[in-house]
């Protein structure tokens, strides 16, 4: 009975609209911040907006995130911005990290994009505040 309940509760996640699941590979990420591999799920999508939750990982760190992605121009080459809040846990530090990103997204196919841009991040770890500007580049796969 427990297995049936588990299957029935997970099944709607896979029966939803396409393009809600995103997997990102590359150096950092616009949605998940300090990550080489990231996963985001779009809670709500419109033609030019995406509201997401997700997580990413580096070799020894983890990032959980939630935010909003807005497309200014959506075509084969799209310009967009992302505002997100992230919780970062790493061997050397942990804390909250508000993040703003601007980027270009080039559609290689219907489900594959190349992303390049920059992000401004502020790390709040309780005892200090650090800010920085970082580039990101990567591949995004939508499912």
Description of each model-found segment:
Residues 1-2, 17:
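N-terminal hydrophobic targeting signals that begin at the initiator methionine
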Residues 3, 126-136, 141:
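Short glycine/proline-enriched turn or capping motifs at secondary-structure junctions
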Residues 3-13:
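Sec-dependent N-terminal signal peptides
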Residues 15-60, 142:
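Short glycine/proline- and aromatic-enriched beta-strand/turn motifs that initiate or cap beta-hairpins
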Residues 17-23, 35, 47-51, 75-81, ...:
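Outer-envelope beta-barrel architecture signal
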Residues 19-21, 31-37, 58-64, 77, ...:
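Residues that define the transmembrane beta-barrel architecture of outer-membrane proteins
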Residues 27, 37-43, 66-70, 83-87, ...:
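Residues on the lipid-exposed face of transmembrane beta-strands in outer-membrane beta-barrel proteins
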Residues 28-32, 44-48, 56-62, 73-75, ...:
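Sequence/structural signature of outer-membrane beta-barrel proteins
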């Amino acid at each position: 009975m427990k297995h049936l309940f588990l299957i029935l509760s997970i099944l709607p996640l896979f029966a939803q609209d396409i393009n809600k699941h995103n997997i990102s590979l590359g150096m950092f990420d616009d949605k998940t911040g300090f990550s080489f591999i990231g996963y985001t799920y779009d809670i709500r999508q419109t033609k030019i907006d995406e509201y997401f939750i997700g997580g990413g990982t580096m070799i020894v760190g983890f990032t959980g995130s939630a935010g909003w992605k807005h497309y200014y121009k959506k075509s084969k080459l799209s310009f967009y911005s992302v505002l997100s809040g992230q919780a970062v846990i790493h061997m050397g530090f942990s804390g909250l990290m508000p993040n703003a990103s601007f980027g270009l997204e080039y559609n290689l196919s219907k489900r594959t994009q190349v992303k390049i841009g920059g992000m401004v991040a502020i790390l709040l770890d309780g005892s200090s505040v650090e800010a920085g500007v970082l580039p990101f580049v990567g591949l995004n796969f939508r499912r």
